[in-house]
């Protein structure tokens, strides 16, 4: 169960970007805010970022929900040359309770950065987190490298937005704008809205299907990811004959940066 939870957390925390729909000569564009790597964690051995993870899950046959909080530390461990002869980096994710007194290696993933894009590969799922150019309104099909129904081993989704993730459009928002988290203010950030769709949310009619799909990330310049909120859950209504009560499946998670070097 612990290994399954670690794998699920790793899958949840990962995000992708793949191909741009809009072509801009970004080096000559006045609103060009930097290369994608300017907004990603610096790939140097010893670099780390620590986050608080607040994870909402459903239990008791989807009748109840609970929020569990963790600490997650992503640490750059080493560099290597990948199969395409590109420099890549191995990152290990460690998990702890909120005390941070004991850390356990959860998963590893690889990062392949360039001035044009930042690729991430986790559990054989290939993601492109940031695309070029970093300009307001740039949109791209961010999940086109994912297979159909990538989370189906964990959740029996039925909503197409949870199955055909390749159709998601990512969009840059609030490019080069300040962003405040608690008492910390970041001078220059970019937000990536990946999905924002819902059906019957909040649930006003418990006799009808409901679904929530929301995925947003904010990156700070020269720091990396500072905030992520994800939600992919569904509500199945009771059967007409009463043989099955209504229930929820899926997850919702908030990830907030609390420390980095």
Predicted regions mapped to residue ranges:
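Bacterial N-terminal signal peptides that target proteins for export
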Residues: 1-9
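C-terminal motif of bacterial Sec signal peptides marking the signal peptidase cleavage site
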Residues: 16-19
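Conserved functional acidic sites
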Residues: 21-261
